[in-house]
Amino acid sequence: MEITSVNHICFSVSDLNTSIQFYKDILHGDLLVSGRTTAYLTIGHTWIALNQEKNIPRNEISHSYTHIAFSIDEEDFQQWIQWLKENQVNILKGRPRDIKDKKSIYFTDPDGHKIELHTGTLKDRMEYYKCENTHMQFYDEF
């Protein structure tokens, strides 16, 4: 018995139509279905579910590093930055990053969910940590 992959990612959103437009137009998601309070899209091979919940607190989300990261090609990195700026997306400062840790840009969706576009892979990250973080214990070889 094993878990084979991430099945889907679900975001609570305050305005379904605004969020559909963001994920469709900004992140090039393919809209599969939308209803009164739910929509499903795919971004790459990832299923994204949006569920509208209008009356819940949303202020804590900005204090967390919790985020979803999508892979992009390094040669497209600057083009993505320009695209996000042209579309008035809220780009975040991000954390200091060594070039060996590859490139990332962080931004938020209309409800403040943090999203990262990252040029590296898990293998890149593990190799970087092995070189830079001697305090870490590694369990599998990459």
From Swiss-Prot:
Protein's name according to its UniProt entry: Metallothiol transferase FosB
Location in or out of the cell: Cytoplasm
Keywords: Antibiotic resistance, Cytoplasm, Magnesium, Metal-binding, Transferase
GO cellular component: cytoplasm
The encoding gene: fosB
Record-linked CDD domains: FosB
Limits of the VOC domain: 5-120
UniProt EC number: 2.5.1.-
Summary of the function given for this chain in its UniProt record: Metallothiol transferase which confers resistance to fosfomycin by catalyzing the addition of a thiol cofactor to fosfomycin. L-cysteine is probably the physiological thiol donor.
Origin organism lineage: Bacteria, Bacillati, Bacillota, Bacilli, Bacillales
